[in-house]
């Protein structure tokens, strides 16, 4: 032992006497405080370099060994690239009412992000200088979560959120941030970003022009709480200011939002960044027009709180410096925050100093991650109606699966998602067939999503059934060999909420050629629709039929699905082959988009489907909408189930067979007109790569559904206020005075639960106190299941308060006959409302009811009286 100690001592001495690591500049020394390293680096930068570091594509500073970096990456429900795990859309994961699962999901997402970073060389002494990174390259800064309130179900981007309730949104958004950023005391695993700050939820086409004006009560009680929770409790490292104006001032220059509230009230010290090209809205004609030009717009944003721009307009700050409109000290204040962000992510430190250095590419799309994605999909599904049809027996002999979403793999990815690996791409139809290997599972698409235009390019007569052949070039001129190519059954390419066009092909300069040959079985007009960001050329049999310049055909139809598409025609003859070709070149705008469809317009009478159902044991209709009908840039015009699908449901009901409707959407759909036409309704959202297995598990009883609605399902579009009205009056479960079709928090199970008499730990409390409600819950059915116990607070003395507001919940798993006491504690936050005297929320004394139960419906709740002194 003595000899060993002497040897160790000698080694320590040798280490101490060995050569010390030397650094050319102090900022390179990881032993120094981050503050000192940041100040040193700032002192070494020229004014031009400082400006170049204030945009999302931050420049490289070769002389200092600083590589370029792209701040923009997305991870709404998985890293937004090809070949990564795709989890359910956040709106679906919110339906699980499972904060721990949300944390686990985003911990895995950040694992995959770090693994991607690790397999690329980002050491500042080794990375080739001058490299420019584009979305799709390894990044550590992710612009999620979206914690806007889903106030109106027509909003296209509501699927990215956690619903229409500020409490639920805050709780789940917080877990997203914690999972993304990690818990290391020295480094952040990745950066999360709270967006879009603050009063922002459509309409999408007006987001660059509208001025959100709301009462201070709505601001503080609805629109701000989730942001505050992420900032104060989550230490979120980035906040994205929204496109729109608030009270007349663009959000990215808004002193009220960025300085008074975010920095001063909440103590936020990290990065504020813009949505992409938001500063351009300041001076672009027909948009905000609050500034005359790019020069004044960038100065306005920089002097009023914006640290980092997604775009390149801030290059004008160099001219602003020369003209004395802004000082170098002003730039330094912004750089202290952005550069600190890169240091705290460990970008300038040796890789082996970071706790995630051993994460390799084996974690990317791993089986462990797929298992959680599948479990998250199971928990997301909400059973809204069941006349005893579900669960289905695995002994069924014949099943008819019909509907436009049944065999669409891309549907499951939703908005702002990547794409899974090939072995994890399975349609909902495939999931059902896998669960019934011995049954006759018949399939018909039945109809398209929203009208009687029937897509034909996936049929056998089109390119021998392969679909359309698409070639992608990494230049604007289709020069050289294509960078990628393949056959596609869906022509829907976009960087709006998507990772790109084709794997490995950067989209900053891209051109595309789509080709197909088909032999029509009919004579007459062939319908087509094409939309792009920069025009297109359509050729039929080598002849140019349409040469749409930018702005012609342009963005028309984006985000609205077929309801907003414009159709044109050309004539075809039965039996005569037709060659079609589309050429596209990306424009100069911030987003790229190309969508096309070739269709035969034919009224769907569903006679064939009725015949297929004649000897079926059950009919499973898989419909709803898709991210092509709701997403960034476009909203739904109404919330009704598309008319053609209503006809489909009625036709299937007429067969007399049991009908199970599986609805895929990222928002509430109004089913009132067909609610009596199906025997069971399952809300499946956009379920990610595990959706096929999850749906089958739920339908056939391998998993007992436990999801609860994170939004209100209204009976009709007529129940909704004006989309442009940001007042919360008569919106969501907190203020809606009507009768919803399916209420917030509602969801059935294959078992039943009974609620005993709840008890409060005390009958009153003062500010700073806490009260605990304890509720006995019993599984009164015959199968195990999970129940989400929900607690709402209703003020009896405050006429301006919500009708009731969610203030706590707990999900419990119970065996048949088992009883568990569930305790939920409420503090000041549950009894706080807007108070003008404090310019914010304050505890309000008075009489309250603490409500507990299985949903927000009055009939599902029991009340306990309580008082705040």
Model-derived segments and spans:
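Glycoside hydrolase catalytic-domain context in secreted enzymes
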Residues: 16-526, 531-834, 840-858, 867-869
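Bacterial Sec-dependent N-terminal signal peptides
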Residues: 1-24
């Amino acid at each position: 032992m003595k000899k060993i100690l002497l040897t160790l001592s000698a080694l320590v001495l040798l280490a101490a006497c060995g050569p010390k690591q030397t650094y050319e500049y102090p900022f390179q020394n990881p032993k120094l405080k981050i503050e000192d390293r940041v100040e040193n680096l700032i002192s070494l930068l020229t004014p031009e370099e400082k400006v170049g570091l204030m945009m999302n594509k931050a420049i490289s500073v070769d002389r200092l060994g600083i590589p370029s970096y792209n701040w923009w990456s997305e991870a709404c429900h998985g890293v937004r690239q090809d070949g990564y795990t795709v989890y359910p859309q956040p709106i679906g994961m919110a339906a699980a009412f499972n904060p721990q699962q949300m944390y686990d999901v985003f911990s895995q997402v950040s694992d995959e992000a770090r693994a991607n970073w690790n397999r690329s060389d980002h050491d500042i002494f080794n990375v080739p200088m001058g490299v420019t990174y584009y979305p799709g390259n390894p990044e550590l800064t992710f612009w999620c979560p979206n914690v806007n309130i889903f106030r109106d179900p027509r909003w296209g981007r509501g699927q990215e959120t956690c619903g229409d309730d500020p409490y639920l949104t805050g709780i789940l958004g917080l877990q997203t941030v914690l999972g993304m950023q990690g818990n290391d005391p020295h480094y952040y695993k990745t950066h999360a970003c709270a967006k879009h700050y603050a009063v922002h939820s459509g309409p999408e086409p007006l987001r660059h022009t509208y001025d959100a004006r709301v009462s201070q009560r709505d601001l503080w009680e609805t629109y701000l709480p989730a942001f505050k929770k992420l900032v104060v409790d989550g230490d979120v490292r980035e906040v994205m200011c929204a496109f729109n104006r608030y009270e007349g001032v663009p959000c990215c220059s808004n002193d009220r939002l960025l300085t008074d509230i975010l920095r001063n009230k909440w103590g936020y010290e990290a990065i504020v960044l813009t949505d992409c090209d938001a500063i351009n809205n300041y001076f672009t004609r027909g948009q905000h027009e609050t500034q005359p030009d790019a020069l004044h717009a960038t100065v306005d944003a920089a002097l009023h709180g914006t640290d980092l721009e997604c775009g390149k307009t801030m290059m004008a700050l160099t001219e602003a410096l020369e003209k004395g409109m802004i000082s170098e000290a002003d730039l330094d204040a912004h750089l202290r925050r952005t550069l600190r962000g890169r240091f705290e992510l460990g970008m300038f430190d040796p890789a082996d100093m970071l706790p995630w250095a051993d994460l390799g590419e084996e974690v990317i799309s791993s089986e462990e991650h797929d298992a959680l994605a599948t479990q998250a999909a199971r928990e997301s599904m909400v059973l809204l109606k069941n006349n005893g049809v579900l669960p289905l027996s695995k002994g069924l002999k014949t099943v008819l699966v019909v509907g436009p979403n049944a065999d669409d793999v891309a549907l499951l990815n939703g908005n702002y998602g990547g794409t899974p690996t090939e072995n994890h791409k399975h349609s909902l139809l495939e999931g059902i067939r896998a669960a019934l290997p011995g049954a006759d599972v018949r399939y018909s698409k039945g109809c398209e999503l929203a009208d009687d235009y029937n897509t034909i390019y996936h049929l056998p007569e089109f390119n021998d059934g392969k679909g359309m052949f698409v070639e992608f070039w990494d230049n604007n001129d289709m020069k050289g060999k294509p960078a990628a190519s393949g056959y596609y059954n869906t022509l829907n390419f976009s960087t709006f909420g998507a990772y790109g066009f084709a794997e490995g092909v950067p989209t900053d300069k891209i051109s595309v050629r789509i080709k197909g040959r088909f032999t029509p079985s009919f004579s007459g007009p062939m319908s087509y629709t094409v939309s792009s960001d920069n025009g297109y050329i359509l050729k039929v049999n080598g002849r140019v039929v349409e040469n749409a310049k930018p702005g012609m055909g342009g963005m028309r139809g984006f985000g609205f699905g077929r309801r907003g598409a414009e159709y044109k025609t050309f004539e075809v003859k039965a039996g005569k082959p037709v060659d079609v070709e589309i050429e596209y070149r990306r424009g100069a705008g911030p987003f790229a988009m190309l969508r096309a469809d070739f269709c035969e317009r034919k009224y769907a009478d569903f006679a064939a489907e009725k015949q297929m159902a004649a000897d079926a044991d059950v009919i499973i209709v898989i419909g709803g909408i898709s991210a092509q009908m709701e997403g960034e840039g476009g909203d739904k015009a109404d919330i009704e189930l598309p008319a053609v699908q209503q006809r489909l449901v009625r036709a299937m009901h007429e067969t007399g067979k049991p009908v199970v409707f599986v609805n895929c959407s990222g928002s509430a759909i109004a089913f009132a007109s067909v609610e009596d036409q199906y025997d069971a309704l399952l809300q499946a959202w956009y379920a990610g790569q595990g959706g096929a297995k999850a749906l089958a598990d739920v339908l056939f009883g391998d998993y007992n559904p436990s999801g609860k609605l994170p939004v209100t399902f209204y009976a009709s579009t007529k129940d909704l206020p004006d989309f442009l009205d940001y007042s919360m009056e008569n919106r969501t479960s907190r203020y809606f005075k009507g009768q919803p079709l399916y209420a917030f928090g509602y969801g059935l199970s294959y078992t039943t639960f009974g609620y005993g008499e709840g008890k409060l730990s005390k009958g009153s409390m003062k500010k700073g106190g806490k009260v605990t409600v304890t509720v006995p819950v019993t599984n009164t059915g015959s199968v195990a299941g999970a129940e989400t116990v929900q607690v709402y607070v209703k003020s009896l003395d405050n006429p301006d308060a919500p009708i009731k507001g969610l203030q706590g919940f707990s999900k419990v798993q119970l065996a048949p006959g088992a009883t568990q006491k569930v305790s939920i504690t409420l503090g000041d936050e549950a009894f706080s409302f807007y108070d003008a005297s404090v310019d914010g929320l304050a505890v309000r004394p008075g009489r309250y009811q603490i409500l507990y139960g299985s949903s927000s419906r009055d009939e599902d709740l029991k009340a306990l009286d309580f008082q705040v002194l």
